[in-house]
Structure formats: structure tokens, C-alpha cells
Amino acid sequence: MVTGIKKTVKVVVVGDGAVGKTSLLILYTTKAFPKDYVPTVFDNFNCLEMYDNKPVNLVLWDTAGQEDYDNLRPLSYPQTDVFIICYSVVKRDSLDNIKYKWLPEINQTNQGTPIILVGTKTDLREDKKTLSQLQESKQEPVSRDEGVALAKEIGAVQFFECSALTGNGVNDIFAAAIKAAFNKPAVTSPTSKSSGKSSPSSTSSKPSKTTTTTTTSSSSSSPPAASTAKPAGEKKLSWGLFRKKDKDEKKPAK
């Protein structure tokens, strides 16, 4: 039996452009892989989930990774419960930028907010064309061990690898994000000691299940809003927040 008041959990997804952030979110919310790559400015997605037998309004924010939006992007950061930082396992620069761009940007306004590190496009590790292109530039795919090491270095609460094309690992990411939002340390009083890094709570006595509703509906464009409540049982997808289509950058997603 479902009990309790619905809690809103805001998750913001960041990372370099074209690393697969939008594909990850679309696959999770619609169970369909997008055919075309269209650069994002901002989109948000609302999903009704269950955590520990309680309803959760999961609000997912998709952001632009391009430098053109460096001043606009942080406007989506207030009241964020969890950040998901993505990099492509076949784009080493996107891994390096986590330390030099994304983590510093987040810490300017949201230091201490739980972070989940995600390596995307794992299916391309076995793609001959991709491997050939990497070899030409004397590079190789980012290994899982490198991702694990970076997650520890930046204090991420979880690390995942996934493929939006195959669906491998996708659901686990968002289940972990909800858990991290519920288990993040409460705001301490001035007399309490505060830690420099956020980590999973150790007070949870047992793991909780996160379930996903599957009914979807669409809505028209509206200003960014992260806390719109919807009836139980509904899974809503909000589209069109400043979505930009750049013909020069349009290409098949991986």
C-alpha cells in the first residue's frame, strides 16, 4: 500500500556536449532511443517513481554542455538534490573536463550536493569504426578502472557505466539518484561538524526498492519548474524548454 506525501527529487544531468545525456534521459523516460542528435539548451522530464513504498516526483533536468551556455546553465542548479555528471567512454576529453570544468562549476553554487558519475556509450568500446578513429589519434577508450578512480577522486557517491543504445545500466543510475537524494546528510546546525564531501548515508538499515510507473503523457512548453505535482500513477514528459536544433551539429546519436 502506498503511503506518505509525495516528495520531489530534482536531478540535474551535466557533461560535455554530445556525450549522450539526452539519449540517456529519453531512453529512461520513454523506453525509446532517439534517432537524431539535436543539441539541447534545457529540457526537463517529470517521472512518478516509488521509493521505500512512497511516491516520488522525479524531476530530471537535461542541460547544454556547450561553452555557449556556460552563463545560462547554472540557472538550473538551485535546489538540486543530486547531480549526474556524464562522460563518454570513447571521448577522453569529456572525462578530463569533469575535474577541470564540471566539478568546479557545480561547487560554485552546490558544493556538498551528491554526485553520481556516469560513463556513457559503452557499446562503442566494441565498435570497429570508433576504435579505428581512436587509433588514428593514438587514443583508446576510457577504461572502467579509470572511471572508478575518478569517482573516488571527486567524491562521487556512485559510479556507473551505461549504454543508452542497449539500455544496459540505465535504470540503475536513476534508482541510485533517488536513493542518494533520500540519504544525503541533513543540514547541520552551526555547532555541528560538517564534512567536506557528500557520501551515502550509513544509517539506512536495509536497501529500498525503486519502481517506475510506465504511463506517459506530453505537455506543452513552459518555464522551468522543478516541483509540479502530478496525480499518482502518471509519468509525465515535459518537452521544449528552449530546445535548439543545429543543422550543422545534427548527426546520429550513439
Swiss-Prot record:
Where is GTP bound in this sequence? 15-22, 62-66, 120-123
Region: Disordered; residue ranges are: 186-254
Record keywords: GTP-binding, Nucleotide-binding
Where does the record place Low complexity bias?
186-231
Q: Which GO terms describe its cellular component?
A: cell projection; cytoplasmic vesicle; cytoskeleton; plasma membrane
Biological process according to GO: actin filament organization; cortical cytoskeleton organization; establishment or maintenance of cell polarity; regulation of actin cytoskeleton organization; regulation of cell shape; signal transduction; small GTPase-mediated signal transduction
Q: Where are the transmembrane segments?
A: none
UniProt motif Effector region: location = 37-45
Task: Give start-end ranges for the coiled-coil region(s).
Answer: none
CDD domains listed in its UniProt record:
Rho
Q: Output compositional bias ranges, type Basic and acidic residues.
A: 232-254
- GO molecular function (one): protein kinase binding
- Stated family: Belongs to the small GTPase superfamily. Rho family.
Q: Which PANTHER family match?
A: RHO FAMILY GTPASE (PTHR24072)
Tell me the protein's name. Answer: Rho-related protein racD
